[in-house]
């Protein structure tokens, strides 16, 4: 009987992510928030998995129609700094493929090989309107600057981690539908700065910045002299060949570096480092970013933030406040709002966090952009998803009401034009064990 139950669960899990064919479909009659504008009584037409038009005309003859009258239509949300597809049960090391504790492979760590399209976290995130995600590796040596749900990295090693390197590895972009979820690997490098980075470098911020500059110098020397390196005809370098190769695009300014940093003075140092070394950076966290908002804007550096961070949980967040998102946006900084930081299970919180940012001064339109078009643009996917426009992916969510209101729910979720099941393991368990009345036993008890 237990085997039958397990098999049934496996079949149900596959049904939540199984492959399907894109359909030509028109979504009509709703208020369409394209990501950059609003179309009342709009029609979104999708063919072959792509948006072909957004306007107010009638649906093409013979096309399947989703009636969105009285509803709100948005692009699928884009979760950033997420663990979706890379971790299942945070306290179980074997189900976590987001971090690598070996100091022999740091920058070259590519989490895309460990992504699981059958992860139970993906359908739950889809129920929150998330259709794409930037999955970022976690630095194995420090939790500073992050608050992970479900003790994401507790018990992750026998006797603790090895001393990790400066870099956590390379991020990937995924879609939350189908069995081939990888959109692109190696979209960004990740590294902790501030308290977390200081811990890696020996305990002081000054050591980390010197170490980072020295690392870039080694990478550039390697890039110029690969033949000499192979002949062992140059000085010994501190990183493995794989790590050196992985960092060449960062040193050349072609791959962005996601820097976890929160203290205002640390942000200033990161901006200076970016300027001096020609490194393209993305600030992750920036809890005190509002103090230096004009400097961030002048440097044209985007920010990934958790807008409800408002407690001085450590000495690099003494000035954290819930108006951070509004202040950064007002200064002209491109922001992307996160779900719970580093989370797989609470990536769906992205819309709640955007709503909280609105309640603390962020304009509604800017909040929608911060969970749709902005993250797509930050990671180099402008016009490809996160926006309802001709040529973009057919990632669309139809909402019962304001998508930033907790009580609004999706009535349809499409990814690449494929309508997704509005179901998740959490809801399957709810339905299975729903009593149906006082005194009634759950179905499994009668088996």
What is each of the regions a protein language model found here?
Residues 1-21:
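Gram-negative bacterial Sec-dependent N-terminal signal peptides
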Residues 30, 42, 389-433:
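C-terminal cap of metal-dependent C-N hydrolases
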Residues 30, 44, 49, 70, ...:
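Divalent metal-coordination and catalytic microenvironments
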Residues 32, 36-74, 91:
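Histidine-rich, glycine-flanked metal-binding segment
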Residues 89-90, 96-108, 256, 297, ...:
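His/Asp/Glu-enriched, well-ordered alpha-helical/loop segment
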Residues 121, 126-281, 409, 444-446:
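Polyanionic/metal-chelating signatures
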Residues 274-280, 298-304, 332-334:
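Glycine-enriched alpha-helix->loop->beta-strand junction motifs that scaffold or abut catalytic
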């Amino acid at each position: 009987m237990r085997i039958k139950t397990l098999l049934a669960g496996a079949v149900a899990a596959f049904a939540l992510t199984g492959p399907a064919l894109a359909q030509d479909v028109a979504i009509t009659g709703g208020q369409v928030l394209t990501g950059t504008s609003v179309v009342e009584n709009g029609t979104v037409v999708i063919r072959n998995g792509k948006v072909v038009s957004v306007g107010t005309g009638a649906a093409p003859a013979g096309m399947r129609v989703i009636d969105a009258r009285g509803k709100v239509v948005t692009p699928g949300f884009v979760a950033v700094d997420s663990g979706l597809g890379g971790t299942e049960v945070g306290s179980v090391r074997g189900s976590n493929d987001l971090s690598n504790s070996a100091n022999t492979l740091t920058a070259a760590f590519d989490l895309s090989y460990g992504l699981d399209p059958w992860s139970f976290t993906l359908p739950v995130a889809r129920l929150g309107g998330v259709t794409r995600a930037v999955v970022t590796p976690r630095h194995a040596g420090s939790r500073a600057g992050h608050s992970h749900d479900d003790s994401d990295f507790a018990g992750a090693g026998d006797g603790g981690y090895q001393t990790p390197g400066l870099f956590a590895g390379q991020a990937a972009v995924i879609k939350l539908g189908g069995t081939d979820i990888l959109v692109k690997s190696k979209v960004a490098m990740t590294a902790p700065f501030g308290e977390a980075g200081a811990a890696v470098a020996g305990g002081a911020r000054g050591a980390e910045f010197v170490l980072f500059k020295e690392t870039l110098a080694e990478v550039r020397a390697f890039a110029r002299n690969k033949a000499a390196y192979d002949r062992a005809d140059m000085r010994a370098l501190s990183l493995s060949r794989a790590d050196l190769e992985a960092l060449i695009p960062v040193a050349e300014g072609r791959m962005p570096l996601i820097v976890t940093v929160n203290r205002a003075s640390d942000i200033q140092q990161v901006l200076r480092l970016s300027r001096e070394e020609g490194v393209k950076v993305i600030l992750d966290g920036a809890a005190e970013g509002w103090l230096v908002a004009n400097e961030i804007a002048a440097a044209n550096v985007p920010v990934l933030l958790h807008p409800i961070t408002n407690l001085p949980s450590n000495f690099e967040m003494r000035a954290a406040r819930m108006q951070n998102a509004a202040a950064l946006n007002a200064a002209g900084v491109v922001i992307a709002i996160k779900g719970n930081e580093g989370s797989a299970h609470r990536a769906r919180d992205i819309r709640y966090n955007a709503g909280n940012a609105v309640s603390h001064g962020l304009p509604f339109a800017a909040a929608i952009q911060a969970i749709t078009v902005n993250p797509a643009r930050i990671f180099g996917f402008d016009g490809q998803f996160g926006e309802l426009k001709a040529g973009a992916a057919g990632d669309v969510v139809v909402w019962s009401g304001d998508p930033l209101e907790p009580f609004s729910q999706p009535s349809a979720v499409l990814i690449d034009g494929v309508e997704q099941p509005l179901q998740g393991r959490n809801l399957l368990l709810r339905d299975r064990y729903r009593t149906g009345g006082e005194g009634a036993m759950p179905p499994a008890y009668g088996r």
